[in-house]
Every structure is written in C-alpha cells, then in structure tokens.
A protein has these predicted regions:
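Selected alpha-helical membrane-embedding segments in polytopic membrane proteins
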Residues: 2-97
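Membrane-interface segments at transmembrane-helix boundaries
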Residues: 20-23, 84-108, 139-140, 144-151, ...
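Hydrophobic alpha-helical transmembrane segments in multi-pass membrane proteins
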Residues: 41-85, 103-139, 156-180
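Short, strongly hydrophobic alpha-helical membrane anchors
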Residues: 181-185
C-alpha cells in the first residue's frame, strides 16, 4: 500500500492525533509541528485545553479563577518559549525560531489533559505530580527536537530556562497580578 507524503510526514494529522503522539513522546510529532507553521494554532488550543483541565482538576475556584488560569497558561507558554529560545538558540547554539519552540512546547503540554485527575480525593495530588513529571520529559524532548541538539543540552536549556522563567513569571505576577502558571513550563 502506497502512502502519501502527508501520511509519511504526519502533516494533516488531526489535533487529537498530534496530542496523542506528543503524549506518547513520539519524537516524529515534535519534528512535524516544529516544521509546520500552521500548527501554531493547534499548539495554542492544546495550551487552552490543558489549562481548563488543570482548573477543573484543582477545583479550588469558580469561573473567574479558571479564566485567570487560562490567561496565565497562555502567558506562561509565551514566556517559556521565549526564554527557552534565548537560552537554547542564542546561548547554547541551537537552531530554532521562537515559533518552532512555541509549537513544540505547546504540544509537549498534551499529557496535561490528565491534570483533570487532580479532582480525585486523596489521590489527585499523586496524579498531578506524575503528570508534571511526564510534562517535564515531554518538554525536554520538545526542546531537543526544536533546537536540534543533544538531550544533555536540552536538559541544561530546560533547567536554565526554568530558573529564568520563574523570575519572569514572578515579575509578571507582581506587576500584572496574573499567575503565569507553572504548568506551562
């Protein structure tokens, strides 16, 4: 059976198929969205879905808090991609654009839909912690694939980026009063 180029490269995959592949840590999907500029909108949808799932999973506030969490998730995503771009591309010699990092890091949040499990009494925190670890691994893969360098450099970029991200997030929270959301990182 012959396959089309779109089937081979994955272009044209549905949002759900891309999210599933990203959650399975399939490096091919990270390469795919890195090079597909039209996937930026899909990556933004992933960030929004994950933010809503996290808000439901935390079940601590009403609609206003959920709205703030979604806004914070988007700001966090933009900041995280920007900081990662500056460190990975400009300091450590990777090769990526900010848009490529936006897309790969957006899809790296795919496992975050399981943050909704945080609502489970007594065990929710454990599920949230496991999802956070999963997101960390997905983020490192996204960074590695987008910047086209080693896993070691991706880990270094993630660690340095996280430290810088925390400083920027705290500054934004202090000035604007919006929690930039650590789930985005």
């Amino acid at each position: 059976v012959e396959r089309t180029q779109a089937e081979i490269t994955g272009r044209g995959r549905s949002l759900t198929a891309r999210m599933m592949a990203a959650a399975k840590l399939e490096t091919a999907v990270y390469e795919e969205v890195e090079h597909d500029a039209s996937a930026t909108g899909q990556a933004a949808i992933v960030v929004g879905i994950v933010a809503v799932c996290a808000a439901i999973g935390s079940a601590t506030g009403g609609a206003g808090e959920a709205f703030g969490a979604v806004v914070g998730a988007y700001l966090g995503w933009l900041v995280w991609a920007g900081v990662t771009y500056l460190i990975g591309d400009k300091l450590l010699g990777g090769t990526a654009t900010w848009g490529e990092l936006l897309r790969t890091l957006g899809f790296a949040q795919s496992p975050g839909v399981l943050y909704i499990l945080g609502i489970i009494p007594l065990l929710g925190w454990l599920a949230v912690f496991a999802v956070w670890l999963w997101l960390l691994v997905a983020g490192i893969i996204a960074i590695r694939q987008a910047l086209d360098f080693s896993t070691g450099k991706a880990v270094l970029t993630a660690v340095l980026g996280m430290l810088a991200y925390i400083v920027v997030a705290l500054a934004i929270a202090a000035v604007v009063g919006v929690d930039v959301g650590m789930a985005a990182a």
